[in-house]
Curated annotation (Swiss-Prot):
Organism whose genome encodes this protein: Neurospora crassa (strain ATCC 24698 / 74-OR23-1A / CBS 708.71 / DSM 1257 / FGSC 987)
Matching InterPro entries: Kynureninase, PyrdxlP-dep_Trfase, PyrdxlP-dep_Trfase_major, PyrdxlP-dep_Trfase_small
Protein name as catalogued: Kynureninase 1
Source domain of life: Eukaryota
BP GO annotations: 'de novo' NAD biosynthetic process from L-tryptophan; anthranilate metabolic process; L-kynurenine catabolic process; L-tryptophan catabolic process to kynurenine; quinolinate biosynthetic process
Amino acid sequence: MSDFTSKVKVLRDGQKPEFPSNANTLEYAQSLDAQDELRHFRNEFIIPTRASLKKKALDGIIPGTQANGTTTSTDADTPCIYFVGNSLGAQPKAVRHYLEAQLETWASIGVNGHFSSLSNSPLTPWQDMAADCAAKSAAIVGAADPSEVVIMNTLTVNLHFMMASFYRPTDKRHKIILEWRPFPSDWYAFQSQIEWHGLDPEKSIVEMQPDENLYLSTEKILATIDEHAEDAALLLLPGIQYYTGQLFDIPRITKYAQERGIVVGWDLAHCAGNVELQLHDWNVDFAVWCTYKYLNGGPGSMAGAFVHERHGKVDMSLGKPVFKPRLSGWYGADKSVRFNMDKEFQPTPGAQGFQVSNPSAIDLTSLAAALSVFNKTSMKDLRSKALVLTAYTEHLLDEIVRRQPEGEEPAFKIITPRDPLQRGTQLSLLLRDGLMDKVAAALEENGVVCDKRKPNVIRVAPVPMYCRFEDVWKFMEIFEAAIRG
């Protein structure tokens, strides 16, 4: 059993792996890269170079194959350290090919592209593109069938559409249980949905607070569910908390809330393409996610939603369709009647019956290209690599802390859970007061791209699709110099 494989096994058991005394060397990092069976996927992506990050105008130069190999001596060829896939994934090389095919199709056959495709194109006819992307996303989120997935809109729009169907407050049950720090757009959606129903957010929102380490335990969540078992209508949590990187126990929390009559939805913005999901088997009522982070669909790319099959049924036994209430539109109509222009809405069975408008074929093209890369591997294999990559990152960060002078306040602490099964790829570093600007400037100057959350948090995400153990080692050299300088 290789060093890499043994670490995967240990981490999947929820344990911390042992690293050798030479772990903090380039040679050891490269040895892990050599054992990585997914390392070739890096060549599927365009990694910005140190030179390209400094661009001020278009010049027709796209960072290419040189930016994906080993480091060379010039900024023009040296790939940056791209640890920000939790904010925007790197561009798959397939995107340019797919977009060029789409533009040629539109130019060549015009409106016929809705129903026809060119024989050597990687794309389906436009009317089938959303369903095709849903089919390619089903395994990523653990749907039992592609019919449980719909690709449409963007995340917050989908959150509104799902809440229109699943948040049905009554005088008795009207509260929404949330975590302490939802992403602001989610928070705005929750507030506005409550107000839309004529309710007061102050009375209808239950906010769960974390402990002093910013950790929200499963026990605290279950206790809150019990406390509001009679008046909560909806539990809506992130699968991974965007600020701390904590991964919640989705199956346990879902089951517990549903047993008390509470509908359960999940915002999986930081889960989809990052951790293994089994939404159907976990009996999740609904979920939403974006595709521009770990799924690499491009800035603002089309988002996804999951609706469990039990909520997507269309009953025709009474001669007219009976289905779960929703905000309806023509593109949610069954394809067999979609172009009949009838007044009676007959939805497509499943999640795709929640569509409203004709989706952008251009946006779907970018996502289709990104998903074509995902479909060459599995979430199990990606998660296995991510576990080791993040554990190695954690180990080297701990070594930096151990090297600090005795008695000196640590320059940072990791606020992401140390349990590998309670986090994804991201590690959030809470910097000592006064360090953020200096560290951020040093990282930028040395070609490191990661996410900064003021006042003091840096989110580091070495995603497994295109990041290397060598990148982690190089990041540590730059980061330690920055906090010491």
